[in-house]
Amino acid sequence: GSMPDYVAKYPVIQTDDERERYKAVFQDQFSEYKELSAEVQAVLRKFDELDAVMSRLPHHSESRQEHERISRIHEEFKKKKNDPTFLEKKERCDYLKNKLSHIKQRIQEYDKVMN
């Protein structure tokens, strides 16, 4: 329930220099966010696809091998989705998203005041 660190770290912008600094941080972390986000989305999308495939599989599948193969892939992705490294990436991704929108908001507020 505590405030995220960036709220205190990025208060209302007072000067053009500050605006420049905020903008630099934004651009720097936006590229990290984009990379992470693409990676995280790919895993989640793949997982959803597999979920759909699994649910469409006939339970008394003619080909047991096919069934087992898809089950195995599904398990792999379940592991990957609950993998601490992946969860960390997902958390970092959400954190960056919120941080970036906070910084962007500060920049927009400053621009409004200045114009």
Question: What would you call each of these model-derived segments?
Answer:
Residues 14, 27-29, 41, 65, ...:
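Residue-identity detector for glutamine
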Residues 4, 8, 50-115:
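Acidic, serine/threonine/proline-rich low-complexity intrinsically disordered regions
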Residues 42-45, 57:
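Eukaryotic short linear interaction motifs
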Residues 2-31:
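Short, charge-rich amphipathic alpha-helices with coiled-coil/heptad character
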